[in-house]
Amino acid sequence: MSRRRAHDTEDESYDHRRNKRRRVSENQEIEDRLESLILRVGERSTSSVESNLEGLVSVLEADLGTFRLKILRILSDCAVRMPEKCTVYTTLVGLLNAKNYKFGGEFVDHMVKTFKESLKLCRWDAARYSLRFLADLVNCHVISATSLLQLLDTMIDVSNEDTVPQVRRDWFVFAVLSTLPWVGRDLYEKKESSLESLLLRIEVYLNKRSKKHHNALRVWTSDAPHPQEEYLDCLWAQIRKLRQDNWAEKHIPRPYLVFDSILCEALQHNLPQITPPPHHDNFEYPMPWVVYRMFDYTDCPDGPNLPGAHSIERFLIEEHLHHIIETHHRERKDCAAQLLNFPFKHKIPLEYCIVEVIFAELFHMPTPRYLDICYGSILIELCKLQPGTLPQVLAQATEILFMRIDSMNTSCFDRFVNWFSYHLSNFKFTWSWDEWDSCLLLDAEHPRPKFIQEVLLKCLRLSYHQRITEMMPTTYAKLIPVTPVPNYKYTSEEAANLPGTTVALQLVGAIRQKCTPEEVVNILKEIPSSGYSGEEMSDGSFNALKIDVFVQTLLNLGSKSFSHSFAAISKFHVVFRALAETEEAQICILHNIFELWSSHQQMMVVLIDKLLKLQIVDCSAVATWIFSKEMTGEFTKMYLWEILHLTIKKMNKHVIKLNVELSDAKEKLSKADSSSSDTDEDTPHKRKKPITHADKPSEEVVERMEEKLEAANVNQKRLFLIVFQRFIMILSEHLLRSDTDGRDPDTDWYRWTIGRLQQVFLMHHEQVQKYSSTLETLLFTSDLDTHILEVFQQFVALRA
């Protein structure tokens, strides 16, 4: 009997475990089904949004007892991750609150917690979407208007904080302003005086805030035909216009209006007192921006009108399109399809809105959110999906950009060149060049001919020289790039008179015979130390002729392709390192690369990048070479600044990498110490796996890492000091010479150069910011010319 009972017990235990697994599996299936239903509510289907909501409320109400926490989590996630469906989800919550007041209160608490956590973790978009959701719950009779106004007032209190960055105060004001389109009408009807008081406080703040940063962020220096408005000023103008219209807007779908008779019977909840977390030095706030405008209603003659620049609909449409790009930017085809499936496409000139928003992203200052090619590839997909209209709108936009290029920001000029050349390469390089031939009468440094020349140089990278020559009208001959071939002087007509010719020819033979680096060194020993007596670059600390012969000969032999050049550099890396012991020697190497490859800009860019990666030349040497007298004729060409920026980025990445490694090492060391002490105290069954001795870095290793980081920071600071000092020198010299000669200093050269200075500040703002006090003390002092000093002050104001 005992055996039988034991057997029965085992069967019962097995059945219990099987039933438990089945229940877990069934619960998981129900949870997945609920999540799918919630995520898809309001999307296009055969039934209306309202009937979808009614059906979903019935399903959720039945499952609240079992899956309450899961439903709370999904709904709060949707509020943050799907802001375009905000009113659909607030209506859903409102209907659930009308049926189950307790659940409504729990959801409000959950949403408040999400909002507070987002603020604490500096998730600014998530915080703004959470605030918007809470505000829209007022429309659904879930939250009282009084408690929402208290929250908005508390947020505006931040604008009165002292000793905090303006960008913090700006964000809280922006968050409140951007919420008002959803709830303004309800507040106006129920609490008009409180709403007016809130708006007055916002106006007082906006009138006194500094806008020193504004000019640094403009796409164009001119306000004709469209003003370049600072984002808070623009949104404030849109809110004022909305107030004039009695808070009636035409864009936001409001499904809760259909259920008003149900919702108005529900009891409301009061928001708790919410205090924004205080400022900490490690908090990073969104930087200000300028609202980009390319079109107005006169540019889109057919179909629906484009909303005015100060209509709230323009803000709502643009924000929605920006969010679509943010959500789908990794998949260009999906992104293009989603943009063209914009919910209100029949009410607006959609193609114009999309093109304007994409260029707003591309030209966003200080840097775009994503790579330039991301926007280019999305535009190509849009042209494929909408071939009847979008290419024409894009051509119209390109024409507008070209006509306004005279006053375009230098960074945006570069992005325009990169986008247009990439776009042409995907459409057989077809363009109506004859319409732009008036630019051929302008000075070569003028932005219009300069743009075409730079576009052709970029097209050359994406094609070949003969193709570029064939695609251009003969009138553009002077702007067509020269054939990119090496200029190897040791086989030229004057080679017999050059001091290194004999050794160069000997070196050619040896390298072709696959000689070793040691054999190359021995051949170079035949060049006497004083062999370059007539060369001003040689100061006695290195042999310039050895560098000349070796670099030009080796790279000429590897000139067939990038791969051949890289292989040559890698094979004779030791020789390069031996010759490049000093910064002067490294500059001499760069001089010889330029002398050999002056007609092939891309080759120079990739070779210098390779030399930096292999640590043959230092970043400071590249910066010094760029500002040398030899490069004066190249100073306004894009490739030179491409080299400077890749050099600075290389240094920045190195510093960031060392920072991360040091932080990880310190964290491991700290965890190892705490783990060893915890292990002694824990009981055996609770003991965690301690960090092993192999994982734990020693104190000496951490100290060495700190020393490496300190040295890297010193080199980074030195690099920025070299760059900014050289800028100041050449700009000051130009301004002084113009003043002495009685000439207008505002030349094309000056605008390019001051634009490049601004570009360095903005493109590398995160790293430069660390040294702003040093730069202010050593370089950007009060006695500096105001034109140069303003660029620095505008940069500092970005995070002030």
Swiss-Prot record:
Region spans: Disordered: 1-26, 669-698
GO cellular component terms listed in the entry, alphabetical order: nuclear cap binding complex; nucleus
Subcellular location: Nucleus
Keywords: mRNA capping, mRNA processing, mRNA splicing, Nucleus, Phosphoprotein, RNA-mediated gene silencing
Sequence positions bearing Phosphothreonine: T9
Superkingdom as given in the UniProt entry: Eukaryota
GO biological-process terms attached to the record: 7-methylguanosine mRNA capping; mRNA export from nucleus; nuclear-transcribed mRNA catabolic process, nonsense-mediated decay; regulatory ncRNA-mediated gene silencing; RNA splicing
Keyword Phosphoprotein: yes
Function in brief: Component of the cap-binding complex (CBC), which binds cotranscriptionally to the 5'-cap of pre-mRNAs and is involved in various processes such as pre-mRNA splicing and RNA-mediated gene silencing (RNAi). The CBC complex is involved in miRNA-mediated RNA interference via its interaction with Ars2 and is required for primary microRNAs (miRNAs) processing. Also involved in innate immunity via the short interfering RNAs (siRNAs) processing machinery by restricting the viral RNA production.
Subunit structure: Component of the nuclear cap-binding complex (CBC), a heterodimer composed of Cbp80 and Cbp20 that interacts with m7GpppG-capped RNA.
Name of the molecule in the record: Nuclear cap-binding protein subunit 1
Gene designation: Cbp80
